[in-house]
C-alpha cells in the first residue's frame, strides 16, 4: 500500500490570485471549523475545497452533508460544469434535517465498505441542524451540539483508520464543518 497523508492545502481554499494564502498549512489530521457571518461564502468555500480534494486525489471520497432547502436556496458559486473535473463524481451529497439524523449518520458510516468510506466529511451549516431551545435556555442545545461534534470527530478518525488499514496506508479522513457567526 502506498503511504498517503492528506492535510489541508492552502491551495484548496485559496485559488483566487488576489487572496493572500496563509504561511503555514493546517496540520495533517487536524479537523477544521469555518466560522463566519451568515451568507459570507462559507458554503462556496467548503464546496470548492471538497471539489479540489476530489480532483487532486482519485482515491478521495467526499461526503458533503447539508440541509437540502438551504443548499437549494443559496447554492455555492461554482465554475462551469464542464470545468469541474472528474472529482465532482466523487462528492456524495447527503441531505439531513436535524441533529438526530446527523448523529445517526455518524454512528453508521463505519458500516460502509472501506473503499467507499469518505476521506473528507463536510458539514455545511452545523448549527442549522439543531432546533433553537425553547424558553431561551440554550445549554441543552449547546450540549447536543458539542456531543454531536465529538461523535463526528470520532467518526472521521474511525473512517481514516479503516481506510488506512484496507485502502491506502496512512490515509486519513478529515472533518470540515461550517457555522454561521
Predicted regions and their residues:
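Glycine-rich P-loop/Walker A and Walker A-like loops and their local beta1-loop-alpha1 context
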Residues: 2-75
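Substrate-engagement module of ASCE P-loop NTPases
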Residues: 140-180
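Large eukaryotic, non-enzymatic subunits of multiprotein complexes that serve as scaffolds/tethers
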Residues: 30-35, 120, 133-136, 151, ...
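Core residues of folded domains in eukaryotic genome-function proteins
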Residues: 28-32, 49, 58-61, 87-92, ...
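Conserved inter-motif catalytic segment of the P-loop NTP-binding fold
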Residues: 63-135
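Extended hydrophobic secondary-structure segments that form protein cores and membrane-embedded regions
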Residues: 33, 64-65, 121-124, 174-180
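Conserved catalytic network of the ASCE P-loop NTPase/AAA+ motor domain
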Residues: 25-26, 55-57, 83-86, 111-116, ...
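Amphipathic alpha-helical interface elements that mediate macromolecular binding in regulatory proteins
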Residues: 44-48, 89, 100-103, 107, ...
Amino acid at each position: 500500500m502506498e503511504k498517503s497523508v492528506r492535510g489541508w492545502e492552502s491551495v484548496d481554499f485559496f485559488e483566487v490570485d488576489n487572496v493572500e494564502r496563509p504561511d503555514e498549512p493546517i496540520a495533517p489530521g487536524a479537523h477544521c471549523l469555518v466560522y463566519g457571518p451568515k451568507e459570507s461564502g462559507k458554503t462556496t468555500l467548503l464546496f470548492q475545497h471538497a471539489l479540489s480534494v476530489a480532483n487532486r486525489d482519485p482515491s478521495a471520497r467526499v461526503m458533503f452533508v447539508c440541509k437540502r432547502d438551504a443548499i437549494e436556496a443559496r447554492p455555492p458559486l461554482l465554475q462551469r460544469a464542464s470545468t469541474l473535473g472528474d472529482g465532482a463524481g466523487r462528492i456524495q451529497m447527503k441531505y439531513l434535517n436535524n441533529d438526530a439524523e446527523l448523529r445517526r449518520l455518524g454512528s453508521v458510516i463505519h458500516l460502509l465498505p472501506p473503499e467507499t468510506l469518505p476521506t473528507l466529511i463536510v458539514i455545511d451549516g452545523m448549527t442549522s441542524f439543531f432546533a433553537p431551545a425553547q424558553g431561551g435556555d440554550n445549554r441543552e442545545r449547546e450540549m447536543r451540539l458539542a456531543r454531536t461534534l465529538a461523535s463526528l470527530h470520532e467518526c472521521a478518525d474511525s473512517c481514516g483508520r479503516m481506510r488506512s488499514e484496507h485502502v491506502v496506508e496512512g490515509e486519513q479522513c478529515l472533518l470540515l464543518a461550517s457555522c454561521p457567526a
